[in-house]
Amino acid sequence: MNSLAIFFALTAALSWALTQTMAKIGLQRMGLVSYLFVRPLFALLFIVPYGLFTSGFHLPYPKLAGIAILGSFTDAFAGTLLYMFAIKISSTHKAASLANTAPFWGVISAVLFLGEKPKLIIFIAAILVALGAYFLVISKGTKSVDYSFWKPLTALGTGILWGFAETVPAKYCLTHGMTPITYQLILVLTAAVSWGSVACLRSKNHHLRYPLRGLRIALFTSFTGFFLGWILWLSSLKLALASQLAPIRGGAMTLFAFILSIILIRERPSRYSYIGMILILIGVFFVSILG
């Protein structure tokens, strides 16, 4: 495989993992709605100039806009909402590991919605992912689950939504002539409108605060998440097959997020969490390579 493609995929994974981890700090300094509303607005400061100075923004026909909005809403609003809720109620390394099963659910989505033929390896990977999810939510020093049923489910739901959005709507739009930067612009605009609507409704009964410390984190994660991560990932896709790069991105994101949560947030995973992370990595790797 092209070594530059591997480098782009790994750096994209690091960028997104850093975004996931720093979001925990951002939510400690800023309200959820305020944080998620300003991030796409900040991202426009990077995406619009980049698009204007490179390939520009092109939309072959209006139908693609609707499909792109659907994928963007699923990814940037519904999926992000579940993930932010997950890291507020549980540790980042657990939430990120479950959310980063997105490549696995992307293959499932391709089978269900794009008509691709399922393989036995998909079901084997599903068992590994389920076992990994179980080990991730086991308390340190015990064999009991320390979270309610809904807490790990929110992070796993994030992975399902992200996997669907990255596979079905995105693939359809890009294969029908939409440029990557155009899809990226629609993604950010959809996020801005969605979270802006929520912010307007929320502000009627609650005062939304935008502290400078929180805005700095939001600006940083808008660059690493909405802009840099996507640019690097799309650059890697130009140099190698997506099926080759998916396990690199998915596995690396899980590993990077796990390590960064320990370094930056001082989380202390249990030994069961390490087992869970390994099982999920194997499951994602199997289904991405052989599925």
Where are these regions (language model features)?
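Residue positions within transmembrane alpha-helices of multi-pass solute transporters
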Residues: 14, 18, 78, 105, ...
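Selected transmembrane alpha-helices and immediately adjacent juxtamembrane segments
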Residues: 149-182
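Membrane-interface interhelical linkers
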Residues: 1-34, 38-70, 80-90, 140-156, ...
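Hydrophobic transmembrane alpha-helices of multi-pass small-molecule transport proteins
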Residues: 42, 47, 107-111, 120-140, ...
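MFS transmembrane alpha-helix packing/gate-lining sites
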Residues: 15, 75, 102, 161, ...
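Alpha-helical transmembrane segments of compact multi-pass small-molecule transporters, enriched
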Residues: 42-46, 98-112, 190, 194, ...
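Juxtamembrane helix-start motifs in multi-pass secondary transporters
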Residues: 35-36, 95, 183, 245
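C-terminal transmembrane-helix exit sites in multi-pass transporters
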Residues: 83, 103-124, 134, 254-274
